[in-house]
Amino acid sequence: MRALLVAGVVALALVVLAPASAAKKGGCPAPWNAGWQKLANKVDAPVYCPTWMPNPLDAKIGGDYQDIYSIGKDHSFLVSFLELGDLGSGDVHVNFRGYPGHTAIPRCPAPVGHGKVPCFSEPVGRMSANGIHATVYQVNQGADQWHIALAWHYDRSLYIVSEHVIAPYRFTTQIKRNLGRLLTSLVLVKPAG
């Protein structure tokens, strides 16, 4: 019982506490801006930089928490941030995706058998903040498997942010709360030039 109580307090603290590097609303935080600007320039399309991340993550591309940085030939991108917990304490994992010039949900290899399935499926609601109207998806594939994802359109492009449902954020309500904060925190970074 005591372990469950301690785990609950730790999970609540992780939801409430914002990382020290969270920035004021208005622009991408200075320590993170160069990486997001470089990404926007490489994909030649706007990208969304968060000004808040779930504790303990930051969103510094090239930083300690970056897990994946991938740009496809079609300029689609995946930027992932991950903290692996010690001794079974769980992971904190957030993905940012963009599909410049494409608005359709992409297709992924089927988890069992042959064929393709939507990479994001089973919409369960909507979230709106910061001028963004996102659809909430609960069944996702690839690097977003076991995540809850928000997907929206901007400038004829599809954008997605997702977070893994796992301890310390093991409840969908915690993840949706984090995704709501992320959505509120997003600032648009346009390509230079």
Model-derived regions: residue spans:
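Short, solvent-exposed recognition patches
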Residues: 25-157
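Bacterial N-terminal signal peptides that target proteins for export
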Residues: 1-6
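Sec/Tat signal peptide C-region and signal peptidase I cleavage site
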Residues: 19-23
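Bacterial N-terminal signal peptides
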Residues: 7-15
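Polybasic, lysine/arginine-rich low-complexity segments
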Residues: 24-25, 177
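Surface-exposed amphipathic alpha-helical segments
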Residues: 155-193
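Hydrophobic alpha-helical transmembrane segments of integral membrane proteins
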Residues: 15-16, 46
